[in-house]
UniProtKB/Swiss-Prot annotation:
UniProt-listed InterPro entries: SPATA31F3-like (IPR027970)
Coiled-coil features, chain-numbered ranges: none
Organism domain of life: Eukaryota
Name listed for the protein in its UniProt record: Protein SPATA31F3
Membrane topology qualifier: Single-pass membrane protein
Amino acid sequence: MLSPTFILWDVGYPFYTYGSIIIIALIIWQVKKNHRGLKLGPNRNCCRRHQKVKQRAKEKTPRARRHSRKEADKPLELLSIMRSQGWLPQEGSVRRLLCADPCCQICNSVALEIQQLISGETTLTTPTSSGPSQGSSCLEVLSMSSLSFDQSQESLPFKQLSLPSATRTVSQLTNQKSVTQSAAKSATKPATKSVSAISIRQYWAGHQQLRQECRGPELPLDAGALSSSSVEEPRIPVNQHVKKKSNSEGILKKQEAVEADLGNKLKHFTQWINPDMKGQGRKECILRCKDEKVAKTKTKKAEKSPPSTKRPMKGAKLEKEEGFFDALQCLDSEFQRQSMESVRSSQSCFLPLSSGSSKRSPLLTCATQPENPSHVSVSTSAEGTCLPQESTQSRKKELRGSQTSASS
């Protein structure tokens, strides 16, 4: 019992058991931790990304401020360098470089800004910029005066203005244009300031005269105007009369269409009452149309074909043969219809005789009922339709004769 094997076994058994339990618990804890990490991983990543974005935005704002400050300081540095080196532009040279047109407002404003930057003043302008400012002010005054003049012209009625006043206004406008051009040219030159002031005064004086002429004389309406107004007044009933005519024409057209529809309906009604008439009418129309077509084709061929032709064309032969066969088919169909009608009429005649005689004597019935009814029907049909057969034969002969004459 005191051997070393038993001692080791007694000591090692609980150690192994407790150790295995601890290892299993550690494995379970690790698995749970990994599972939680998988679940919470996206949220943590998103939170980290948001934090990074916020940090970048915070960093960008001071960078942008620094960049803007640097850009604002660059022109000042350049100006300081130009002043130190004596590279500043002379008066009016910037405006000449920008644009040759002295009336350009954009170039004038840019020249003013450049002059302000050069001088370092934001509120007051230098005397060199007085020239462009005067030019711009002159242009503004001229534009405002032209707008007011246009408004005054639009406010006045067109009839009150006469022809001499219109000619005066045109001449004055041309003078105004020349004055504006002279004012614009004078604004560019500082030496001719007095000339520009005089031209502006002249323009204002002419403009005031135009206003007085437009507002003051209010001429009464002439006889021509009254006559034109009297002519214009009765135009309304004339238009009404035209409208009435158009309405009456539309009503007449509608009535004609209704009458045509009624006529078609009556035709259909008569055909519905008498179906025999309907079939006959259709067949007669078909025959007439075909006869007319054949006649037209013959006349056209006779006109087109010269007398010295020896061999006619194949297309003409085919058309002639087709028309001939169509006519023959129509005649055959008409002949068959007439024969059927005659057979029906003969049968209706024989039936009462046979029914009446069968009661009295069987011999009469045998005699009246033949062994071959087909012969009887044929004979009756032949007897009843002698005239249609003759008419159809005569038509066939006529068509054949016309065909031979046309082919020859």
